[in-house]
Amino acid sequence: MSTDSKSLFRSSVSNRVGQVRPPSNPFAALLVVLVSLLGGCAGLVDKPARPVLYDFGPGTATSTSVPTRSLRGAVVLADVEAAGALDGSAVLYRLGYADSHQLRPYAQSRWSAPPPQLVRQRLREQLGRERVILNPGEGAALARSEGLLPRSLRIELEEFSHFFESPAVSVGMLRLRATLLENTAGGEKLLAQRNVVVRRPAPTPDAPGGVRALTAAVDAAAEELSQWLAQVP
């Protein structure tokens, strides 16, 4: 073989060796593919929706005052009592046309506070337009300052749900028991008791409609209780 042929052969071999690349790491390649797939899937997953919070609205928009002479009609409003699901924050409904014994929660709707707290707040506001409404523990202060023992009003919330009579027709249903007690030196004395049942139509067959119907039911119950308290001697 001539010198030129040998040089040409060495050059050809050298070029081929330079073009050969070591094989890539198969595990690294697989990792890149998996990361890409996971990133794509993450973009497809929706974030969980936050529940919508409801209450009874802002209430009275103007300031009110009760004359001092109304102290003799002052009432201590105890905490509203409720049991079971009514003491939670879920907005509940019943399908009267299917199974009225089953309470069902709206999946994405919640009360801003348990219904007993919201009901007490609304009753205090509505009843306070006609008389002095005191919190538990404030009656003793009134007794010391005015020599009066205010009566106590206890409320038991028994039903508070969005009731569907049919898929398109529904009402806000409220049922409560009110007990009026006289505070005496010898203890509490039962004066009167009243069962209040209110149904108010819902404007729409959904959670917002149920909330509006239940708000109207609470206001109607407060009006009924106000008239009842005025009639008890």
For the regions a language model picked out, list residue spans one by one:
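Short secondary-structure boundary motifs at beta->alpha junctions and helix caps
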Residues: 92, 102-110, 184-227
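A structural "domain/chain start" motif
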Residues: 42-117, 232-233
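Surface-exposed short loop/turn segments
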Residues: 43-64, 130-185
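N-terminal secretory signal peptides that target proteins for export/translocation
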Residues: 1-24
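Sec-exported extracytoplasmic/periplasmic mature domains
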Residues: 124, 128-132, 162, 226-233
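C-terminal motif of bacterial Sec signal peptides marking the signal peptidase cleavage site
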Residues: 37-40
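Sec-dependent signal peptide recognition
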Residues: 25-32
